[in-house]
């Protein structure tokens, strides 16, 4: 274009208005100017011819420039790509500064087609395809919705085309010969796929309905012979004969026939991925059948809201766990003294005492990766999955070290070996062997603390429990009265209490009313109280609601609508009165709180006592308890001269107590100072640890002990028969009696008893639990910069409510 303008300018046709003549050296004009313009014109003409001849060269150069740009996602394979080394850098011209390029705005992780991330790269777990591979249909993803919509439109249009397309009208060979060929309306015949013939009509002679017609043929040879014969019969000769064209068409019906197969394969793939090995995966690997050997453990980082301030009643266990975290955060504190960091600890104790809750609190405050897995997740239907998952679990732990690994319900995989050689037992033993090797073998795991929880430590393999694997065994038993008070304080925080109630006093009172309760029972009591208050549309929770909740947890649901015959109700009243009076006049019996003849749970009556916080029992104390338990059966016999089935539970308790005294506690002179383990309920007993003669002696002594207790109870209630009758009659009238009613009927109890929180904790040094921390654990979940801690710094203990910094 520049050359053309220069040519026109040289010819004088393109001189702009007002433009002065071209200045020449020396400022000369005239003839010299004309000569200069002729030379310039000659040069421009030569350049224009050259440019016209090199048009193909320019196109090729432009194509090469286009191809020099690497495809998107393959930049690193090209030397001048943005990820590769640049072979030639544009040199900076002297005196010319490069302007800094504006920084590219960061792409959102989920934006753009492709789901975020480069093509060919590994998609993150939030990508819709990764979620779809795990069996999760990502309806909330816009890209997935777009693909789904286009796929649905494609298949919908495909089906619409095949369902509603014009299929023509089928005719027979006879109709074709008589109605079409004989009338001369056929232009040509199209043999489609050698299966049928489509009739094409002569222009202007199309049938009224506008549909084409077709007819089936058996074979091409037969069709050609019949057509030849028919045209000869009709006298169609030479050029008038109908031409036959052979064509092959694909109507797409094969796609429709493949649709059921595709759907079945898709369903099978989805089922495999959502099968036993694919459910509950954590996003590591493909999932499904090809990753059954991968661990299903979860790595928790800042995902748990439970803190140590939410765990109470097990302060000693909390200190142990804090120390394990301190091992990981500040190992130099122990290594300077030559100490080795313990490998792990196992939390044991009855159900509901807070083992898993303590592990959750550790995950919430440890400030190190916390890996959790259940013992049952190691065992699957495939052989060899258990050991493979153990290896993968510890590989994951080493990758995240320092970290804490928690195996919940480890008894599922850690049972004692050598109990039969069944298939499942062999797989469990292989898994246990791999676990033993990973915990303390040649490939020793460093900076990984292993915690485990179980309520069946007696069935665990001894090799698993030895030091070097689980160095510490932390027993978490039912909380004492101080522990229950602390637990009640935790669970009373979110509750809307009556304004007249003080949380401190209420927690202590409830702790004194719930002896033997675990932490889970205490939480259940608080929740039941809130439910009872909501049931009655109360604005807040009062003390009566808590008392009803305790009765609900101990005795079961109150059945006020259950109909009892008058005779049955009278029997129940005298039965419960026998219990109450026997316990009232026996020194070592538990104090009575309430007695009721309203049916609860499985029982027709209910008596609530207040057991002492006691760990050692004498023979006399156990005998008084047996007599109190037999008071109901004795009362029935004294007042009615007959016995009923209502004492079944009482007799079971008495029998268990008698066997425990003789077999376990060595409290019988004839059997001697021996102790045998009593079988647990549900255990299969193949042989007894004592002879038949000893078994017979034990049975005889148990029977004698129970008979002595029964005779003693008969003598007591016969003496106090009038008191039993008073209590029974008042029960029939009021249905529920408390301690004050008993005092009015029988007078004060002749023995001293404790009933308040202060009386129970008297002599223990303090009213509350000791939650102070040792000096070395003040900053248990923080890394120390120096080796020495400033002695004057005061750090609030996490036990008292402070979270991590």
From Swiss-Prot:
Pro-piece positions: 40-67
Residues that, per the record, bind Zn(2+): 575, 579, 650
Single GO cellular component term: mitochondrial inner membrane
Biased composition (Gly residues): 109-118
Segments for region (Disordered): 74-127, 760-805
Post-translational modification: Upon import into the mitochondrion, the N-terminal transit peptide is cleaved to generate an intermediate form which undergoes autocatalytic proteolytic processing to generate the proteolytically active mature form.
Record: residues binding ATP: 311-312, 353-357, 491
An individual GO BP term: calcium import into the mitochondrion
Entry's EC annotation: 3.4.24.-, 3.6.-.-
Membrane-protein topology: Multi-pass membrane protein
Superkingdom of this protein's organism: Eukaryota
InterPro entries documented for this protein: AAA+_ATPase, AAA_lid_3, ATP-dep_Zn_Metalloprotease, ATPase_AAA_core, ATPase_AAA_CS, FtsH, P-loop_NTPase, Pept_M41_FtsH_extracell
UniProt keyword annotations, A-Z: ATP-binding, Hydrolase, Membrane, Metal-binding, Metalloprotease, Mitochondrion, Mitochondrion inner membrane, Nucleotide-binding, Protease, Transit peptide, Transmembrane, Transmembrane helix, Zinc
Pfam families named among the record's database cross-references: AAA (PF00004), AAA_lid_3 (PF17862), FtsH_ext (PF06480), Peptidase_M41 (PF01434)
Catalyses which reaction(s): ATP + H2O = ADP + phosphate + H(+)
Coarse class of the protein's main subcellular location: mitochondrion
Cystine crosslinks: none
Role summary: Catalytic component of the m-AAA protease, a protease that plays a key role in proteostasis of inner mitochondrial membrane proteins, and which is essential for axonal and neuron development. AFG3L2 possesses both ATPase and protease activities: the ATPase activity is required to unfold substrates, threading them into the internal proteolytic cavity for hydrolysis into small peptide fragments. The m-AAA protease carries out protein quality control in the inner membrane of the mitochondria by mediating degradation of mistranslated or misfolded polypeptides.
Database matches in PANTHER family: AFG3-LIKE PROTEIN 2 (PTHR43655:SF9), ATP-DEPENDENT PROTEASE (PTHR43655)
Cited HAMAP family: FtsH (MF_01458)
Family stated for the protein in its record: In the N-terminal section; belongs to the AAA ATPase family.
Name of the protein described by the UniProt record: Mitochondrial inner membrane m-AAA protease component AFG3L2
Organism, as annotated: Bos taurus (Bovine)
């Amino acid at each position: 274009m520049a050359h053309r303008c220069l040519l026109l300018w040289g010819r004088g046709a393109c001189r702009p208005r007002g433009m002065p003549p071209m200045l020449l050296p020396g400022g000369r004009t005239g003839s010299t100017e004309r000569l200069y313009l002729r030379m310039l014109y000659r040069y421009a003409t030569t350049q224009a011819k050259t440019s016209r001849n090199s048009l193909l060269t320019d196109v090729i150069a432009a194509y090469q420039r286009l191809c020099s740009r690497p495809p998107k996602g393959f930049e690193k394979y090209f030397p001048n790509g943005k990820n590769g080394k640049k072979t030639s850098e544009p040199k900076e011209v002297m005196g010319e500064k490069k302007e800094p390029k504006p920084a590219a705005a960061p792409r959102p992780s989920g934006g753009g087609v492709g789901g975020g991330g480069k093509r060919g790269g590994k998609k993150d777990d939030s990508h819709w395809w990764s979620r779809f591979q795990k069996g999760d249909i990502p309806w909330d993803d816009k890209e997935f919705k777009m693909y789904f919509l286009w796929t649905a439109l494609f298949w919908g249009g495909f089906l619409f085309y095949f369902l509603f397309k014009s299929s023509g009208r089928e005719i027979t060979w006879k109709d074709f010969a008589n109605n079409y060929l004989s009338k001369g309306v056929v232009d040509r015949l199209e043999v489609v796929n050698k299966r049928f013939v489509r009739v094409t009509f002569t222009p202007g002679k199309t049938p009224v309905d506008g549909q084409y017609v077709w007819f089936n043929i058996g074979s091409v040879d037969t069709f050609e012979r019949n057509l030849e014969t028919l045209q000869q019969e009709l006298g169609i000769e030479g050029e008038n004969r109908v031409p036959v064209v052979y064509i092959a068409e694909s109507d797409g019906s094969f796609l429709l026939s493949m649709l059921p197969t595709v759907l079945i394969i898709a369903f099978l793939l989805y089922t495999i991925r959502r099968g036993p090995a694919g459910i509950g995966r954590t996003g590591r690997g493909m999932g499904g059948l090809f990753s059954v050997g991968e661990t299903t453990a979860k790595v928790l980082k800042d995902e748990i809201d439970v803190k140590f301030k939410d765990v109470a009643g097990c302060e000693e266990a909390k200190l142990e766990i804090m120390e394990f975290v301190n091992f990981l955060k500040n190992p130099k504190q122990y290594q300077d003294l030559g100490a080795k960091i313990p490998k792990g600890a196992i939390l044991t104790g009855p159900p509901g005492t807070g083992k898993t809750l303590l592990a959750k609190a550790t995950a919430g405050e440890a400030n190190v990766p916390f890996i959790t897995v259940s013992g049952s997740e190691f065992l699957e239907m495939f052989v060899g999955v258990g050991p493979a998952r153990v290896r993968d679990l510890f590989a994951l732990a080493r990758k995240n070290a320092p970290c804490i690994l928690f195996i919940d319900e480890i008894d599922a995989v850690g049972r004692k070996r050598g109990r039969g050689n069944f298939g499942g037992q062999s797989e469990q033993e292989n898994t246990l062997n791999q676990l033993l090797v990973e915990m303390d073998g040649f490939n020793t795991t460093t900076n990984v603390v292993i915690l485990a929880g179980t309520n069946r430590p007696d069935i665990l393999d001894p090799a698993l429990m030895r030091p070097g694997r689980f160095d510490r065994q932390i027993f978490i038993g039912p909380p004492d009265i101080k522990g229950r008070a602390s637990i009640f304080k935790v669970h009373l925080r979110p509750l809307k209490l009556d304004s007249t109630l003080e949380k401190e006093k209420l927690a202590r009172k409830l702790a004194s009313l719930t002896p033997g309760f675990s932490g889970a029972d205490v939480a259940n009591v608080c929740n039941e109280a809130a439910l009872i208050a909501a049931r009655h549309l109360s604005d807040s929770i009062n003390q009566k609601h808590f008392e009803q909740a305790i009765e609900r947890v101990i005795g079961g649901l109150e059945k006020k609508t259950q109909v009892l015959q008058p005779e049955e109700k009278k029997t129940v009243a005298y039965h419960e009165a026998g219990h109450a009076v026997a316990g009232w006049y026996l020194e070592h019996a538990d104090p009575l709180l309430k007695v009721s003849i309203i049916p609860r749970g499985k029982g027709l009556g209910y008596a609530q006592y207040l057991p002492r916080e006691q760990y050692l029992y004498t023979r006399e104390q156990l005998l008084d308890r047996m007599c109190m338990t037999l008071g109901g059966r004795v009362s029935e016999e004294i007042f009615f001269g007959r016995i009923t089935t209502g004492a079944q539970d009482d007799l079971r308790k008495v029998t268990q107590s008698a066997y425990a005294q003789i077999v376990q506690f060595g409290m019988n002179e004839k059997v001697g100072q021996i102790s045998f383990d009593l079988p647990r309920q549900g255990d299969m007993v193949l042989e007894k640890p004592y002879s038949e003669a000893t078994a017979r002696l034990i049975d005889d002594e148990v029977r004698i002990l129970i008979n002595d207790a029964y005779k003693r109870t008969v003598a007591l209630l016969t003496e106090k028969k009038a008191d039993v009758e008073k209590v029974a009659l008042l029960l029939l009238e009021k249905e529920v009696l408390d301690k004050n009613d008993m005092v009015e009927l029988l007078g004060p109890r002749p023995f001293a008893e404790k009933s308040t929180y202060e009386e129970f904790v008297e002599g223990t040094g303090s009213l509350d639990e000791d939650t102070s921390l040792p000096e070395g654990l003040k900053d248990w979940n923080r890394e120390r910069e120096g080796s020495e801690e400033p002695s004057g710094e005061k750090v609030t203990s996490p036990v008292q409510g402070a979270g991590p910094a």
